[in-house]
Amino acid sequence: MKEEDTKKKADVAAWAYALRLRTLPLSWAGTVMAAGLAASVGVFRWSVFVLMFFTASLLQILSNMANDYGDYVKGTDGESRIGPRRALASGRIAPGEFVRGMFVVCLLTMGVGLALVLTAFGWRAIGYVLLFLALGAGCIVAAVKYTVGRRAYGYSGWGEVFVFLFFGLVAVCGGTFLYTGRWDALWLLPGAALGLPSSGVLHLNNLRDAEGDRANGKNTLASRMSLGWGLAFQCGLIVGAIVLLLVYMDATYRMTLWYLPTALCLINIPLTVQI
């Protein structure tokens, strides 16, 4: 009996490790920002927030699992990898079992996503329902195709672009639309401001793995750059996010006085990188 309990605990620990739950806050950021934008115009709804929260979490988990599986199949997660070993590469979960787990997460994502769209619009707004179902399908495909398949976009340097689109623009603009049912071009500013540092998270990981990725034919943006240019690009993403957020604050709330202290912070960034 004790052996069975120990095995169950080991299985749970292996799956928790495979899901990479520590990355979930990255998916929550877009949900929280969309909720804040909706609340600022008085249309926040808890039901939409909760369903959006779980949909974003499941998409992040699916992306993590697909990344693990794709790199394992292509042999990228070898001994040369600097970061922590993934669940498949370490042998903690069998490949067939892992694929079944991905399928379950995919079904859960579709179910919760459908509930989110119907809660936001109902069946009467069938045009919006179909639009967001198509958008949701695109999110699922993008989550899987990062490293899975012969044309995985993560292996051709497009990872940061897709993260910018889906973790930034789609999460914030699409999420806010689910609350309001209307479009505002100003949402592109906070959406892009979130998308840039989200891309920075991926870029920083790829900088860490650049040497191993080059050896395994994974042509990420970081593997095509020198370390110096990679760090400069990382700083550009962060600075760009700050500038876009300031522009949005000024356009929406006329908070021009924020520019001065922020400019002083930006001046110090090159010094910080040199140190």
Region annotations inferred by a language model:
Residues 25, 29-33, 161-176, 223-227:
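Small-residue-rich segments of transmembrane alpha-helices in multi-pass membrane proteins
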Residues 64-67, 87, 141-154, 202, ...:
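C-terminal ends of transmembrane helices
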Residues 84-182:
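Intramembrane alpha-helical segments
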Residues 1-51, 55, 150-153, 163:
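Topogenic membrane-insertion module of multi-pass membrane proteins
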Residues 250-275:
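Extended hydrophobic alpha-helices typical of membrane-associated regions
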Residues 16, 24-28, 46-54, 99-103, ...:
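Hydrophobic alpha-helical transmembrane segments
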Residues 33, 41-66, 131-144, 184-204:
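Membrane-embedded alpha-helical segments that form the functional core of polytopic membrane enzymes
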Residues 66-108, 195-240:
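Solvent-exposed interhelical
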